[in-house]
Structure formats: structure tokens, C-alpha cells
């Protein structure tokens, strides 16, 4: 595995030592990104506890939009398999659900189980790209965007607005469902939009059955939520600066901390692809990144260590969006994986061990 220290090539042992020295000299370190396999996430939380650092996943906007709605009023959710097998009416909100194969897979099937079995499936969209390749009824979003549109739709559904508007027709179609599903991306609609959609789903369930199918972010955010919950009892943005895990989604936003000058060192963990943060390199930083990624270069950070990519060069437990669970992903071609391939968990553990040897602790 390749490694760099201050732009120069180094072996992994030297890079681990440099990373430990950098973190030992910091007062308010941040561990960010967290786009990695579960074992690496676990190692990151252990390292943060040792350092007294805070953690912030790159998936934060999606995670907290969903968690905000959940904490405000709960959620009624379903799975991909249940949607394909049972739903006769599906409302697709926004643009992101049209990316990938989900909508095409839904459109290719008909309800085969439950009360809607044998019915024709109706696909409806609100504020989407009006994809002509898949037959559906499209409703344009208001000029104010998706959040305003969802507010108007819920008002028509509750009877607080009346008339012949398009949203009135959409509300009637939703109430006519035998088993309905709303598909949306929490980050795209935002916390207020997610809360509005869950409220609409509760309203619809007064007379029929309706659920949400929320899209997971592509950066292992849901795995981070689960691991943080069983490790700290809280959501992912936690800090260990006062010897115990404290959750604060605003205070431990890494971009805010770094912009405000609160953090004096950072560790960026991305064994899986993740968008590079604007702050990377603006303060002493360690980058643990997947081999072959754009960030696998000496200029990325003060210390750069490349590791195996889970599901490709190494195995690892990852969020499986199709199944809606954390599942183990084998290396795609283990025969081609060099024996010396480092894992993110292994590197983080070695850094923590060196810090403990140096007497560094929260």
C-alpha cells in the first residue's frame, strides 16, 4: 500500500508514526468522512474516544434530515422488496430516486402480494425529471421548490385547501391506493420536507395503507447511524472531549468546526469513494483513502495512507441498500489482492495503539 508524509513517499509504518505524532500534538481533533466498512467505523470511534475527538460522517446532511423527521413525529417505512411486491400506487418525489435502477425495477413489476395483488401499478412523480422512458403521471413542483409543494399537497390531502389544482388530483390518487409508497431522498427534500412527507403518510393511513421508502445515502451513513447507536447510544455526530460521548449535530459539524477555527487537526476516512471536503489540507490532516482514488496522492494531506477498498480489494461489512441491512461484502477478486494490503480498520488501530504507547488519552 502506498503512503506519503508531507508529500514524500513513505512506508506505512512511517506514515502511521507521523499520523500518531500529528494527532498527539492536537488539542481539538476531528474525525470526518467515515465512508468506510463497519470495522473501520468501529476503529474510528475507538480512536476518537482515546483522543477526545469528535466524529462527523460525510453523509450528515442525509442522515440528519431523516433523523430529524423521525425524532419529530416518528416514521412509517417499508422496504424495497415490500414496495415491489405490494404497492399499487407509488409517488416518486424529486430527482434522486430516478438515479439508478430502483424505479425501473418497480415499474417492471406489478403487485403480487397482499390486498393490491393483481392490481395495475400507478407510478406518480412530483418534481421529478419527467422521465419519458418509464410510464408515469408527472406533477410539476411549485416555483418555491419541493418543500412548498409538499406543504400544498398535504394541505389538499387534509382538506385545508380545495379546488381543481393538480395537487388536489394527486391527493385523490394517493387516497385511492390500497397499499401506497412514497419514495424520496431525505437529503434532497431536507428535514422539513421529510417531516412533511411523514405527516402526509400519517394522514393517508387514516383511511388506507401508506409507507415511505427512503433512499440511503451512498456513503455508508446508515451503517454509521447503527454503529454509533450501538457504540454510544446516540447519532453519529458525537464528541468525546469530556470523557463520554456527547451528541450535538450542530456543534460537531466538522465543516463548521474547521471554518470557526475550533478544530486544529483532522483525520479524513474514506476507504470508499466520498466527495472531498473543501477544508481538506487547510489544517494538519491525515487522509486514509481507498487505493486508486483521486485522493490517493501525496498532496492530498500532510499524511496520506491508502487502504483496500471494501467489496473490491478487501472484504467488509457494508450497508446493503437492496436488503436494507448491514451485510458482508466479499472482495470481488481476492486472488488479485496483494497479501500486504492494509485495511482502514487496521491502520486506525495501529494509530490508536501508538497514541496509547505515547501516553495520549482523553
Swiss-Prot record:
UniProt name for this protein: Formyltransferase/hydrolase complex Fhc subunit B
Oligomeric form and interacting partners: Octaheteromer. Part of the formyltransferase/hydrolase complex fhc; composed of FhcA, FhcB, FhcC and FhcD.
Lineage, opening ranks: Bacteria, Pseudomonadati, Pseudomonadota, Alphaproteobacteria, Hyphomicrobiales
GO cellular component terms attached to this protein's record: cytoplasm
Subcellular location: Cytoplasm
Pathway of action: One-carbon metabolism; formaldehyde degradation; formate from formaldehyde (H(4)MPT route): step 4/5
UniProt keyword list: Cytoplasm, One-carbon metabolism
Entry annotated with the keyword Cytoplasm: yes
Gene this protein is translated from: fhcB
Alphabetized Gene3D superfamilies for the sequence: TPP-binding domain
Keyword Cytoplasm (UniProt): yes
Misc. remarks from the entry: Although FhcB and FhcC do not possess a formylMFR dehydrogenase (Fmd) activity and have an unknown function, they are required for the stability of the complex.
Function: Involved in the transformation of 5-formyl tetrahydromethanopterin (5-formyl-H(4)MPT) to methanofuran (MFR) and formate via the formylmethanofuran (formyl-MFR).
Transmembrane segments: none
Any single GO BP term: formaldehyde catabolic process
Amino acid at each position: 500500500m502506498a503512503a506519503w508524509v508531507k508529500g514524500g513517499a513513505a512506508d506505512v509504518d512511517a506514515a502511521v508514526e507521523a499520523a500518531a505524532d500529528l494527532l498527539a500534538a492536537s488539542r481539538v481533533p476531528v474525525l470526518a468522512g467515515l465512508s468506510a466498512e463497519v470495522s473501520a467505523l468501529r476503529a474510528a470511534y475507538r480512536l476518537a474516544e482515546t483522543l477526545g475527538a469528535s466524529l462527523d460522517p460525510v453523509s450528515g446532511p442525509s442522515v440528519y434530515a431523516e433523523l430529524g423527521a423521525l425524532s419529530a413525529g416518528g416514521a412509517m417505512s417499508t422496504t424495497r422488496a415490500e414496495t415491489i411486491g405490494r404497492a399499487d400506487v407509488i409517488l416518486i418525489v424529486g430527482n434522486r430516486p430516478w438515479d439508478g435502477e430502483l424505479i425501473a425495477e418497480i415499474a417492471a413489476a406489478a403487485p403480487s402480494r397482499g390486498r393490491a395483488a393483481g392490481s395495475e401499478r400507478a407510478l406518480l412523480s412530483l418534481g421529478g425529471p419527467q422521465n419519458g422512458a418509464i410510464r408515469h403521471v408527472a406533477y410539476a413542483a411549485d416555483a418555491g421548490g419541493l418543500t412548498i409543494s409538499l406543504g400544498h399537497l398535504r394541505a389538499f390531502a387534509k382538506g385545508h385547501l380545495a379546488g381543481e389544482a393538480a395537487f388536489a388530483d394527486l391527493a385523490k390518487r394517493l387516497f385511492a391506493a390500497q397499499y401506497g409508497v412514497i419514495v424520496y431522498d431525505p437529503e434532497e427534500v431536507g428535514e422539513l420536507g421529510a417531516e412533511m412527507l411523514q405527516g402526509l403518510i400519517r394522514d393517508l393511513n387514516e383511511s388506507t395503507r401508506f409507507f415511505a421508502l427512503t433512499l440511503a445515502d451512498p456513503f455508508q451513513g446508515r451503517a454509521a447511524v447503527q454503529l454509533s447507536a450501538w457504540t454510544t447510544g446516540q447519532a453519529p455526530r458525537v464528541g468525546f472531549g469530556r470523557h463520554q460521548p456527547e451528541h450535538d449535530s450542530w456543534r460537531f459539524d466538522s465543516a463548521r468546526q474547521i471554518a470557526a477555527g475550533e478544530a486544529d487537526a483532522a483525520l479524513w476516512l474514506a476507504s470508499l469513494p466520498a466527495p472531498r471536503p473543501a477544508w481538506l489540507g487547510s489544517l494538519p490532516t491525515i487522509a486514509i483513502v481507498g487505493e486508486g482514488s483521486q485522493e490517493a496522492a501525496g498532496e492530498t494531506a500532510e499524511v496520506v495512507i491508502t487502504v483496500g477498498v471494501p467489496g473490491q480489494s478487501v472484504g467488509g461489512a457494508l450497508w446493503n441498500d437492496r436488503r436494507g441491512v448491514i451485510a458482508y461484502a466479499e472482495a470481488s477478486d481476492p486472488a488479485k489482492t496483494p497479501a500486504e494490503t492494509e485495511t482502514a480498520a487496521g491502520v486506525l488501530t495501529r494509530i490508536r495503539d501508538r497514541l496509547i504507547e505515547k501516553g495520549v488519552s482523553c
